[in-house]
Amino acid sequence: MKAIDNKIEQFALYLQRKNNLDHIQFLKVRLGLQVVVSNLAKTIVTYGVALIFHTFLYTLFTHVSYFLVRRYAHGAHAKSSLLCHVQNLALFVALPWLLVYFQVNLGIMYSVVAIGTVLIIYYAPSATKKQPIPSHLKMKKKLLSIIITMVLLIISFLAPEPFKQLILLGITLESITLLPIFFPREDN
């Protein structure tokens, strides 16, 4: 990992020299590169494991529906990169597989996602200390979160099984990240 950090540092320094960036701009560029590399690594691990366990499409449908809502609803993050990897594997590889394997009843899934939709309506967007949401964007993000959730619900009615359950799972997982219990007092 140290070698990757060194390469990021070298590339950020190169960009700083090439574009006459001040120190703050350099730090922003370096952080951006670190985030991209970290997210790429998490994606490779998650989808690599999904391929190994033959759950790629299950993972993809769950993850895409989760991400589409999260794009505007935001929500809690894992406390560390390792915990993020573990949560990704549990929530986007193991849980979709279990959902399909046990053939969870659609009535149960729609009941759970109804509660999740209420959580999205009530709590979205949910800012964090590291990722605050400007007040002028809050209403727009709330509306987009609700609209995307409704569109995904409509798609779930049209999608074949097990993909409808996986779409509903993605919505439900995202709605759970909005709960205030996942935010320290100072983040609220």
From Swiss-Prot:
It is found in: Cell membrane. It comes from Staphylococcus haemolyticus (strain JCSC1435). Signal peptide: none annotated. This is Accessory gene regulator protein B. Its main location: membrane. GO terms for cellular component: plasma membrane. Its EC number is 3.4.-.-. It is a multi-pass membrane protein. The lineage of its organism: Bacteria, Bacillati, Bacillota, Bacilli, Bacillales. Essential for the production of a quorum sensing system signal molecule, the autoinducing peptide (AIP). This quorum sensing system is responsible for the regulation of the expression of virulence factor genes. Involved in the proteolytic processing of AgrD, the precursor of AIP.
